[in-house]
């Protein structure tokens, strides 16, 4: 199960497509990609 946008995340969790875990904030943010 992937983590949705602004969902809490840690290094061991995978965010959903086009999202990346923000180390600074500790939640999933958009990684800037569309494809």
From Swiss-Prot:
- List the residue(s) that the UniProt entry marks as the site Pharmacophore for Nav1.7/SCN9A: 6, 19, 27, 29-31
Task: Please report any disulfide bonds recorded for this protein chain, giving both cysteine positions.
Answer: 2-16, 9-21, 15-28
Tagged with keyword tRNA processing: no
Q: What is the effect of changing residue 17 to E?
A: Decrease in ability to inhibit Nav1.2/SCN2A, Nav1.5/SCN5A, Nav1.6/SCN8A and Nav1.7/SCN9A
What happens to this protein after translation, modification-wise? An unnatural amidation at Ser-35 provokes a 14-fold increased toxin ability to inhibit Nav1.2/SCN2A and a ~2-fold decreased toxin ability to inhibit both Nav1.5/SCN5A and Nav1.6/SCN8A.
Kindly give the InterPro entries that the UniProt entry links to this protein. Answer: Huwentoxin-1
- Give the recorded effect for residue 35 to A: Reduced ability to inhibit nociceptor cation channel TRPA1
Effect listed in the UniProt record for changing residue 6 to A: Decrease in ability to inhibit Nav1.7/SCN9A
Q: Which GO terms describe its cellular component?
A: extracellular region
Q: Where in the cell is it found?
A: Secreted
Pfam family of this protein, just one?
Answer: Toxin_12
Outcome of substituting residue 31 to A? Decrease in ability to inhibit Nav1.2/SCN2A and Nav1.7/SCN9A
Instruction: Provide the alphabetized UniProt keywords.
Output: Calcium channel impairing toxin, Disulfide bond, Ion channel impairing toxin, Knottin, Neurotoxin, Pharmaceutical, Potassium channel impairing toxin, Secreted, Toxin, Voltage-gated calcium channel impairing toxin, Voltage-gated potassium channel impairing toxin, Voltage-gated sodium channel impairing toxin
Q: Which GO terms describe its molecular function?
A: calcium channel inhibitor activity; potassium channel regulator activity; sodium channel regulator activity; toxin activity
What does altering residue 23 to A do? Reduced ability to inhibit sodium channel Nav1.2/SCN2A
Tissue-specificity statement: Expressed by the venom gland.
Tagged with keyword Disulfide bond: yes
| Reported effect, residue 13 to A | Reduced ability to inhibit nociceptor cation channel TRPA1
The record makes one more remark, namely: The primary structure of the mature peptide is identical to that of Beta/omega-theraphotoxin-Bp1a from Bumba pulcherrimaklaasi (AC P0DQN3).
Q: What's written under domain?
A: The presence of a 'disulfide through disulfide knot' structurally defines this protein as a knottin.
Could you say which protein family the record assigns here? Belongs to the neurotoxin 10 (Hwtx-1) family. 54 (ProTx-1) subfamily.
Say what the protein does: Ion channel impairing toxin that inhibits voltage-gated calcium channel Cav3.1/CACNA1G (IC(50)=53 nM), voltage-gated potassium channels Kv2.1/KCNB1 (IC(50)=411 nM), all sodium channels tested (Nav1.2/SCN2A (IC(50)=60-104 nM), Nav1.5/SCN5A (IC(50)=76-358 nM), Nav1.6/SCN8A (IC(50)=21-133 nM), Nav1.7/SCN9A (IC(50)=51-95 nM), and Nav1.8/SCN10A) and the nociceptor cation channel TRPA1 (IC(50)=389 nM). Acts as a potent and selective blocker of voltage-gated calcium channel Cav3.1/CACNA1G, but not of Cav3.2/CACNA1H, and Cav3.3/CACNA1I.
The name of this protein is Beta/omega-theraphotoxin-Tp1a
- What does UniProt list as this organism's lineage? Eukaryota, Metazoa, Ecdysozoa, Arthropoda, Chelicerata
């Amino acid at each position: 199960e992937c983590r949705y946008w602004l969902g809490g995340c840690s290094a061991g969790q995978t965010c959903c497509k086009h999202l990346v875990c923000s180390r600074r904030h500790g939640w999933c943010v958009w990684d800037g990609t569309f494809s």
